[in-house]
Amino acid sequence: MNNFPWLTAILLLPISAGSSILFIPQRGNKAVRWYTICICLLELLLMTYVFYYNFQLDDPLIQLEEDCNWINLFDFHWRLGIDGLSIGPILLTGFITTLATSAAWPVTRNSRLFHFLMLAMYSGQIGSFSSRDLLLFFIMWELELIPVYLLLSMWGGKKRLYSATKFILYTAGGSIFLLIGVLGMGLYSSNQPMLNFETSANQSYPVGLEILFYFGFLIAYAAKPPIIPLHTWLPDTHGEAHYSTCMLLAGILLKMGAYGLVRINMELLPHAHSLFSPWLVIVGTLQIIYAASTSLGQRNLKKRIAYSSVSHMGSTIIGIGSMTDTALNGAILQIISHGFIGAALFFLAGTSYDRIRFLYLDEMGGIAIPMPKIFTMFSIFSMASLASPGMSGFVAEFLVFLGIITSPKYLFIPKILITVVMAIGMILTPIYLLSMSRQMFYGYKLFNVPNSYFVDSGPREIFILISILLPVMGIGIYPDFVLSLSVDKVEAILANYFNG
């Protein structure tokens, strides 16, 4: 049973089954929706079954490994495998994509293409998280960008083409650095390309070259989480995209950059990472303050939530730069936690817009009375986003805090400064989230819209929101549910630094 290529099956199922969508009749929108949801559910069940029976929690090594020679000419292998670092993002991808396909129920224009692109994106993301070959990682990284660009440019607001072009310029520009880094590492000191992650991890480079590789990969990944100053595509894109696409962007796409930083920069380039880590902590700290302050000034609801995503990813970057197992576990937990919370907030923003047709906060007001269910869920997820105790965000940010305070790498005064600045960011977070809730839901009704728009959340929407709320509260109450996946792998990664 262990010889069966489970990861290949998990990776290829969405895109191969999705290809059949194109043969469904043009007017069969309902059939397309149900078919896509069934594929996503089947994929999620397959994933859960395979990981439950074949994944050992206490083993930090690569599991479910597959290695097949693909192109002999330059020793290119189809090499897949998962460990404690990748299993969480893969399960998150399955969960959020399944809910995003349910959220896309109202999409009727070109619905066959829309759902096919969602499934193609699904395969690309699973491929990125499970690749064990540098070139395969790059191919999957790029494969995932094409459907995202088409989803952004074809469905959304009036400026969707502008925002999609901005997105592809940032991410494709970063991909050039990723390709150069992959080829540089693969071709270094060998006539035969060495693209295997394990071989690259044991390879030592001159310090100058390692710093060059590290910086190239950092630029490639900085556009995704995003890290300031490469973040400006995110508010525009979220402001224009359809909310089901926003769920995939906030829930999964932003996490790929943080995953790449740990997987390649930390694991394969440890000496350069120990030099760059203080700068990552500084940038992450500034990002929390900058994005929280900017979010407060946004009139557009979706842009305000987008800047809150940038702010929350700052704590992930601090965790990656802290060089302690506590903070790195917190960063990985924040990746999972924000995946759920960000997806839920964008879904709520989109469903609210579908009803009231306003995105600007100063045009809203008094929505709580006609739409109490949306008001309740928005309030709960706002509390989760501002790291309220009992929610997953609290545990993640607390671990990052604790990790940076106890880090032996930094002196006492810098640690105090970083902690104070992070605390200021955590004070700003409830200010912009609670003011957003006040402007939307409280006060008088400032607009004249026919009452037919004021239909509260239906069963489908409530089901999606409760499905996201349960893991958010579950992780908040029992964080070991996620931490047990990554704790051994994190120890193994950091052992390279303290032994070397």
Curated annotation (Swiss-Prot):
The keyword Chaperone is assigned to this record: no
Reaction catalysis annotation: a plastoquinone + NADH + (n+1) H(+)(in) = a plastoquinol + NAD(+) + n H(+)(out); a plastoquinone + NADPH + (n+1) H(+)(in) = a plastoquinol + NADP(+) + n H(+)(out)
GO terms for biological process, alphabetical: aerobic respiration; ATP synthesis coupled electron transport; electron transport coupled proton transport
Record-listed E.C. numbers: 7.1.1.-
Transmembrane residue ranges: 4-24, 37-57, 80-100, 134-154, 167-187, 208-228, 242-262, 272-292, 330-350, 386-406, 416-436, 462-482
Topological relation to the membrane, as annotated: Multi-pass membrane protein
A GO CC annotation given for this chain: chloroplast thylakoid membrane
Top-level taxon of origin: Eukaryota
UniProt entry keywords in alphabetical sequence: Chloroplast, Membrane, NAD, NADP, Plastid, Plastoquinone, Quinone, Thylakoid, Translocase, Transmembrane, Transmembrane helix
Subcellular location: Plastid, Chloroplast thylakoid membrane
InterPro entries with a match to the protein in the record: NADH_Q_OxRdtase_chain4, NADH_Q_OxRdtase_chainM/4, NADH_UbQ_OxRdtase, ND/Mrp_TM
The keyword rRNA processing appears for this protein: no
Molecular function as annotated in GO: NADH dehydrogenase (ubiquinone) activity; ubiquinone binding
Family that this chain belongs to: Belongs to the complex I subunit 4 family.
HAMAP family linked: NDH1_NuoM (MF_00491)
Protein name according to UniProt: NAD(P)H-quinone oxidoreductase chain 4, chloroplastic
Record organism: Amborella trichopoda
Gene: ndhD
